[in-house]
């Protein structure tokens, strides 16, 4: 019989059992990486953030109180790591802009990490704002409840529902206009 996530967490916390934590990583790494790839649109960056997520989870495992699912707790860490990476990237972009203004040419661009996301999904998600896209991916692609998405993103459940409604409406208007009732 396989141990539950909660049993593995307990073993990892009480005995610092790396094998138990390794099993947790094995169970959840695909979901975390997939979500981060949808957020970042860059597989290499997503994998880096996923690695940071699991390191942080190991360090903070003792803080998981068992309220809610381990997967939701892990996704919250992944989202926080994503936001930290985003802030760092924005700061680097401001620095690159300053360098370009100073020397009159843009810094060398590294074209590695081209997106491998399915074109149709990317087109659908491309019409959404950041918050709508993040919420839609969490609730539909990752299968989390509105409550879990609320906890991960630090948004009220009503806001989560509003983002989903607006996101669906934008997709419907853009890609399925014949289904929109005319008044």
Enumerate the language-model features and the residues they cover.
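Short helix-capping/turn signature of helix-turn-helix
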Residues: 27-30, 38-41, 137-145
């Amino acid at each position: 019989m396989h141990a539950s996530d909660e049993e593995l967490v307990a073993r990892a916390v009480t005995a610092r059992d790396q094998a138990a934590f390794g099993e947790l990583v094995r169970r959840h790494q695909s979901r975390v990486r997939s979500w981060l790839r949808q957020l970042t649109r860059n597989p290499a960056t997503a994998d880096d953030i996923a690695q940071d997520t699991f390191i942080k989870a190991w360090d903070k495992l003792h803080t998981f109180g068992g309220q809610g699912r381990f997967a939701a707790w892990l996704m919250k860490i992944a989202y926080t790591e994503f936001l930290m990476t985003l802030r760092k990237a924005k700061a680097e972009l401001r620095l690159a802009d300053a360098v370009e203004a100073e020397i009159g040419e843009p810094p060398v661009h590294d074209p590695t990490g081209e997106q491998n996301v399915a074109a149709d999904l990317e087109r659908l998600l491309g019409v959404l704002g950041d918050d709508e896209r993040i919420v839609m991916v969490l609730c539909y692609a990752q299968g989390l409840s509105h409550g879990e998405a609320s906890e991960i993103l630090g948004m009220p459940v009503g806001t989560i529902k509003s983002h989903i409604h607006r996101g669906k409406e934008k997709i419907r208007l853009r890609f399925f206009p014949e289904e929109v009732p005319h008044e």
